[in-house]
Amino acid sequence: MRTKIELGKLGENLAADFLERRGFRIVDTNWRCPSGEIDLVAFDGEFLVIAEVKARRSLRYGHPFEAITDAKLRRLRTLAVLWARHHGFFSSPIRIDAVAVLIPQGEEPRLEHLRGLG
């Protein structure tokens, strides 16, 4: 059984591969600043995409997307603007996405992508 940190890292790696196979260009991972952390930053066409990755071993405590609260979404919006300013992307439209990664013991991972949160 993986630790929570190992599960999160595996989930982020699987999510990055998943998005790349769908044409996204990953430009940053685990970007941190005093306001928080962004799991994945990517481009989907013209959109600068901030992707929140939620990995779980099971649905016992609910679907991974249920862990994205209104407060988390507000923080992601703030982080998106901070990342764009820090990296000089002033004209790209910004979109917040989420990737749910379910990694049951002994089974293949299952991923879901939700575009354009709130």
Curated annotation (Swiss-Prot):
Top-level taxonomic group: Bacteria
Entry-linked CDD domains: PoNe_Nuclease (cd20736)
GO MF term set: nucleic acid binding
Family annotation (Pfam families): UPF0102 (PF02021)
Coiled coil: none
Entry-linked PANTHER family: UPF0102 PROTEIN YRAN
Similarity comment: Belongs to the UPF0102 family.
Matches recorded under NCBIfam families: PRK12497.1-3 (NF009150), PRK12497.3-3 (NF009154)
Stored HAMAP family: UPF0102
Name the UniProt record assigns to this protein: UPF0102 protein RSal33209_1090
Organism (species): Renibacterium salmoninarum (strain ATCC 33209 / DSM 20767 / JCM 11484 / NBRC 15589 / NCIMB 2235)
